[in-house]
Curated annotation (Swiss-Prot):
Testis specific; only expressed in round spermatids. GO terms for molecular function: protein kinase A binding. Residues 219-232 are annotated as: PKA-RI and PKA-RII subunit binding domain. Residues 184-207, 287-323 are annotated as: Disordered. The lineage of its organism: Eukaryota, Metazoa, Chordata, Craniata, Vertebrata. This is A-kinase anchor protein 4. It comes from the Eukaryota. It is linked to Spermatogenic failure. A male infertility disorder caused by spermatogenesis defects that result in non-obstructive azoospermia. The disease is caused by variants affecting the gene represented in this entry. The modification Phosphothreonine is found at residue 506.
Amino acid sequence: MMAYSDTTMMSDDIDWLRSHRGVCKVDLYNPEGQQDQDRKVICFVDVSTLNVEDKDYKDAASSSSEGNLNLGSLEEKEIIVIKDTEKKDQSKTEGSVCLFKQAPSDPVSVLNWLLSDLQKYALGFQHALSPSTSTCKHKVGDTEGEYHRASSENCYSVYADQVNIDYLMNRPQNLRLEMTAAKNTNNNQSPSAPPAKPPSTQRAVISPDGECSIDDLSFYVNRLSSLVIQMAHKEIKEKLEGKSKCLHHSICPSPGNKERISPRTPASKIASEMAYEAVELTAAEMRGTGEESREGGQKSFLYSELSNKSKSGDKQMSQRESKEFADSISKGLMVYANQVASDMMVSLMKTLKVHSSGKPIPASVVLKRVLLRHTKEIVSDLIDSCMKNLHNITGVLMTDSDFVSAVKRNLFNQWKQNATDIMEAMLKRLVSALIGEEKETKSQSLSYASLKAGSHDPKCRNQSLEFSTMKAEMKERDKGKMKSDPCKSLTSAEKVGEHILKEGLTIWNQKQGNSCKVATKACSNKDEKGEKINASTDSLAKDLIVSALKLIQYHLTQQTKGKDTCEEDCPGSTMGYMAQSTQYEKCGGGQSAKALSVKQLESHRAPGPSTCQKENQHLDSQKMDMSNIVLMLIQKLLNENPFKCEDPCEGENKCSEPRASKAASMSNRSDKAEEQCQEHQELDCTSGMKQANGQFIDKLVESVMKLCLIMAKYSNDGAALAELEEQAASANKPNFRGTRCIHSGAMPQNYQDSLGHEVIVNNQCSTNSLQKQLQAVLQWIAASQFNVPMLYFMGDKDGQLEKLPQVSAKAAEKGYSVGGLLQEVMKFAKERQPDEAVGKVARKQLLDWLLANL
């Protein structure tokens, strides 16, 4: 039986990060000496790892559910729980099978994929522990609204994303657009643009690799001749409508045959219909009966036109229509048609009528000669016309930030072969922005720098210069729009920082011995001291600190003008989070900081109008203090002895920003405050970095990498800031466990029904050691939320979970809750980000890390 249960929605309402329920005991299952107790067995099966040939298991699963369970089509967000309804009375053990698909790990969005798997395990425990005996199929992330119930058959909700994306299956054009985007990746076509129809005369066969399997010359000549014929045909019609006369002369060179040849006799159907239609539309009489030619048996078809100059009114009308026609069609296409149409028509008709030794001459031979003769001047005119039209069009397009972002993404995707030059250009752009150059030099965008770095043709360089000039002209006009939307102005700089840091990490790990050469010019003019202690790590640490602080200063300065607008748009929760981080800095990360942070977090989330008013008053009174503290920290760190290489003008610029409390950069400040505390503590421990070691470098790299990832990913989004607040809370306070559970009062009765039932878990999935340990810990967290007194794990033949009982005992001894344990798991996942970015293997397994850090 397949049914949707109303109680399945309760696991979605659990606030996992703030749950204060205690952790349960964990042990490995040993069948020897076990008495027949009231326990439940849950078997979690990852259907993506099932063997296709294992038909007996699938048939058993299908028959037990009394329905058609197609495990191959099971979605990632779905979970199917099958309960054993045939248990015997003398046995107290009840079994359940939970079918699901594991979510792929995402190192950037740790919270999303951890909660996705945790929701699935929680649903499995919830259905297995409930007294209901029906089999349930549940979608993670569904709501009880009528819309989702009505469209549950054809609507799929993506749970892992921050935004709920609905894909309707009854609209086939959406699938077609996706297929078009996949096929036209190399053509730089937009996914929303419909695919262009091939010409009717095109007979090219496209191979799976996207290359033409027929002769390239004849293929392109065929397409080009079809285009020219159509343009000439349209030009004839326009001229006829403008009361111009088109005269066609049929010349019969044979002396014995002077009869007129019908225009419908040529073999080309397109040319015949075009000529016949032109003759029918014109009112002029056919002049001339024929001329003799020196070569016998040859026939030709000539095309010419005469303007009607007898009436001045017709002439003026013709001029007006000609002007409108030239305005409606691109100038480059008109130049192309006027220069090539006549020659193309003559050559085509000659080819179709001339016979040599009884065999026709291929049309491609004659067309190739014509094309080669006109290619140079045609391409030159087309380039000039396109650049002029591009200047007019981009004047409107460059004011659209979405278009600019799309252009930059295409530059990154299409020019991977010039990655070195592009990275150098981006680095120069970032350095010029960080050292505070004049605003006139900032007008050249990242697109121009990348285009100039990848162009080698003189004409392409001229085009890029015109493009940059046009962008500089639009800069002043674009300032008004950028003031109203300051959040999007940081997108390019944030992405540049992310790419530069990732490349820097890769190069640093490859060349650790020569990393001293990476020092920036800002620290190159510093006087060398007498003692040289760990030159490579010392210079790298200084470079990372100065770069991070300058990057923070740059973003604080950029957000000054849009402060008022951002403060109105952003909620007060962001300010509360910044106040929390600032209090943590002032207290030095001790127990008092923990108490202040908990108090601030509770007041920030407490309902009621009076609490909100107090919070607003408290935030308004601390705005100036927090801003001054942040600026003083930056100035103090940059004025230390190792960092006195900074220009004195930068200190004045930072001191001139007393009102730098901007909500759009709160996430950057919070992460910066954490980074500054770590750096300052490490500087005190190592006495000016004279004994800098690998651990200090790792912390610096992690802080800078985390800063760039946050700026690039979240980009001042409200929902993302809330998630960032939850993640950063665990990073700032490793022992943070005192928060409250918002939904604790909404627990259903069947949560309490699970008290007293010991649970045995069996995991049927072939994952690696790290994934298996992470899966077991998440199942431990889910079982603790449902008040399971004792959790057993069976099937640990390789001993990967032998340390889990020790971890559970230590967590219970330290007083950890469900929320605190989940925050520790998130902290472990975030520490693995720098290693995964450079392809390194994790230094510690999850259970070893928990034993060392709990």
